[in-house]
């Protein structure tokens, strides 16, 4: 049976973690580290702030049960996602966010390991002005 979570942000189902977690490949004190609650699964979410309006995210987790996420909607930004393990391993995605409500399903006992790069609007505006 799937558990359903209603969230305002995708990452709010994680608990606060430490940058000194030995499972992390590399971490700095400025990184934001979140860990999967033991009741839901095992793993982490690492948020690395590269520069203003550019963030690198590393996710590596496995769930005990299926989870359904209902989200109010992410703020406007774009994401490049690279799947390293899990159901979509080897694939990459471009995901634009427009602030619209979303629904996502994550399956139990599958490893989700991916890298995400997020670009926020101010840097996007500069880029699109240069391109046009």
Predicted regions mapped to residue ranges:
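Short Lys/Arg-enriched alpha/beta "domain-start" segment
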Residues: 1-36
